[in-house]
Amino acid sequence: NSGNELSFSKFDIAHRIMVQAAYTTPKYWNNWMSTSISVIYNAFSGSRYSLTMNEKSDFNGDGFSGNSLLYIPTESELAKMNFVDEYDKNELVRTAEEGRQAFARWIENDDYAKNHRGQYAVRNSNLSNWEHEINLHLAQTIYNPKGLGKLEFTFDIINFANMLNKKWGVNYSSAYNLSPLTVASLTTDNNGQKTPTYYFNNAK
């Protein structure tokens, strides 16, 4: 595989911020006890993922489906792509033209795709949203009055902010791929030329 193009690792974390604050009370209750509390803030740029096509067939002939990197068409190329109506249990979900327009809007709303029209997406090109997490650590220490050791009870709350508001501390880790486009069918003519049809996925 030495000829493969270099790309970002799936596990690449471009940026990380970590802040910790802690406080321990003086001993109280006749020097039998003390209490410690720690607050840990952890933030990092999101997980990397690839833009691919959701294939119902082996689109690129590598023996696998669902792993073909997305070609991001120019406006003129998009106008020539063969979209088809999308159905769910015989009910029309989206017409071919609606699918084309939805894909065009998706391209304009994705920073990477918008700036790489006319190219194939590179592996792990995109980053999900930043993730923020606040963890709480509480420790209650009981001292032996004769100085023969101590007993400590701890209590941890992981992702404390998410307990207060479900929109805080959200984990955006994605699967390895995001597929805004499905290859609905792939026909091959007598000359071996493949002609795909497409419909749009509701990619986030």
Predicted features along the sequence, with ranges:
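Gram-negative outer-membrane beta-barrel transporters
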Residues: 1-47
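Gly/Thr-rich phosphate-binding loop signature of adenosyl cofactor/nucleotide-binding cores
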Residues: 157-159
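Outer-membrane beta-barrel proteins
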Residues: 30, 44-51, 162-167
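Short conserved catalytic/interaction loops centered on acidic-Pro-aromatic/His motifs
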Residues: 147-151, 164-173
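Extracytoplasmic gating/loop element in the C-terminal half of outer-membrane beta-barrel translocons
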Residues: 36-145, 152, 174-203
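A structural signal for well-ordered alpha-helical segments within the folded catalytic domains
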Residues: 12-19, 23, 132-136, 149, ...
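Short, solvent-exposed loop/turn segments that connect beta-strands within catalytic domains
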Residues: 29-31, 146-149
